[in-house]
């Protein structure tokens, strides 16, 4: 009992000290992120057509906020809103920037997460981003912008991400994420406005972020189920005829009352133990006690107790409760009456409340 109490205290302290990987349900969070973006698909073809070099990598950053809808059984679900500078690609000629493609916009996504370790989630996001793409061209090597050649588009793009998030504290989390944005913008040359060059790249980025979670407080501790143990003892002379294993009709009311109490115990495990007095051979007494235990167990199974949740064992004359009380009793009838407490069936029920 003392060891069990200590174990429950230790478990409670451990649960209180570990931050949940995902925020608590029905709470908000907000954060910032930064990293490196890389443009793919179409950039090389555009640079070749314009006869310029290109630079695909750039700095990216953003802000985000979310609402935690679900956090149960290691599974989390949140909705996230953010605004990003998605990065820029540059056309280069003789070491100078001659063209620039920049992107920024808002995005909305669903974020599903799974807790793999205490405080550590892996997650995936899927959503949509409304992206403004600006195409800037420069008329000379000094970087003077030609406003006549400037263009911009605003288009919806698919947004996807995978990452890992670790709760440093219940209120503070860090994340590492890879995000990709599909088919960004659609560049059209000014001299051919109805013709689209195949340039609407994908943008991949790797970001590190930090977020603050509002209204976390202490992580909820789930109380351990209360253990329930009950023991019932049946006088065999009331339950069975002497030397027999068949239940008497009047035993039904007693067994039904015990079954009513057993049914209040959750996840109950039932152990039925049969005992006899010391009269007779050991072999006969073990056999009789086993048959009596089986009769009681079968009655409970017929009432609804699962067969794999109940066991029956006959112990014969073992563990007498009369001790030496009847040692001086003379005569068979008197001895049988004195040893009546030893002829019993004990029922032990263990489960939770």
From Swiss-Prot:
One of its GO terms (cellular component) is cell outer membrane. GO terms for biological process: monoatomic ion transmembrane transport. The record marks 80, 175 as: Part of salt bridge gating mechanism. It is a multi-pass membrane protein. Monomer and homodimer. Non-typeable Haemophilus influenzae (NTHi) is a primary pathogen in otitis media (inflammation of the middle ear). This is Outer membrane protein P5. It comes from Haemophilus influenzae.
């Amino acid at each position: 009992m003392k060891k069990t109490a200590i174990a429950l205290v230790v478990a409670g302290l451990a649960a209180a000290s570990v931050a949940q990987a995902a925020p608590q349900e029905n709470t908000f969070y907000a954060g910032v992120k930064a990293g490196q973006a890389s443009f793919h698909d179409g950039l090389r073809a555009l640079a070749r057509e314009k006869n310029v070099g290109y630079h695909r990598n750039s700095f990216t950053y953003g802000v985000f906020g979310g609402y935690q809808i679900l956090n149960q059984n290691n599974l989390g679900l949140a909705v996230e809103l953010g605004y990003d500078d998605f990065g820029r690609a540059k056309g280069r000629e003789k070491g100078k920037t001659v063209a620039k493609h920049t992107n920024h916009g808002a995005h909305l996504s669903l974020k599903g997460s799974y807790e793999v370790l205490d405080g550590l989630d892996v997650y995936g996001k899927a959503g949509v981003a409304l992206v403004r793409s600006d195409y800037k061209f420069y008329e000379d090597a000094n970087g003077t912008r030609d406003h006549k050649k400037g263009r911009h588009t605003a288009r919806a793009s698919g947004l996807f991400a995978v990452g890992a998030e670790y709760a440093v504290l219940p209120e503070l989390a860090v994340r590492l994420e890879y995000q990709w944005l599909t088919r960004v913008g659609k560049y059209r040359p000014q001299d051919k406005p109805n013709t689209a060059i195949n340039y609407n790249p994908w943008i991949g980025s790797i970001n590190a972020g930090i977020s603050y979670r509002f209204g976390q407080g202490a992580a909820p501790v789930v109380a351990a189920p209360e253990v329930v143990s009950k023991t019932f003892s049946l006088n065999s002379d009331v339950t069975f005829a002497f030397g027999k294993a068949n239940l008497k009709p009047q035993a039904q009311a007693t067994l039904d009352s015990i079954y009513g109490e057993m049914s209040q115990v959750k996840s109950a495990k039932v152990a039925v133990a049969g005992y006899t007095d010391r009269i007779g051979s050991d072999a006969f007494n073990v056999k009789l006690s086993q048959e009596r235990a089986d009769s009681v167990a079968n009655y409970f199974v017929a009432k609804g107790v699962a067969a794999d949740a109940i066991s029956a064992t006959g112990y014969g004359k073992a563990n007498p409760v009369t001790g030496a009380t009847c040692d001086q009793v003379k005569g068979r009838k008197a001895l049988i009456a004195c040893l009546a407490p030893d002829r019993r069936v004990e029922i032990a029920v263990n489960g939770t409340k």
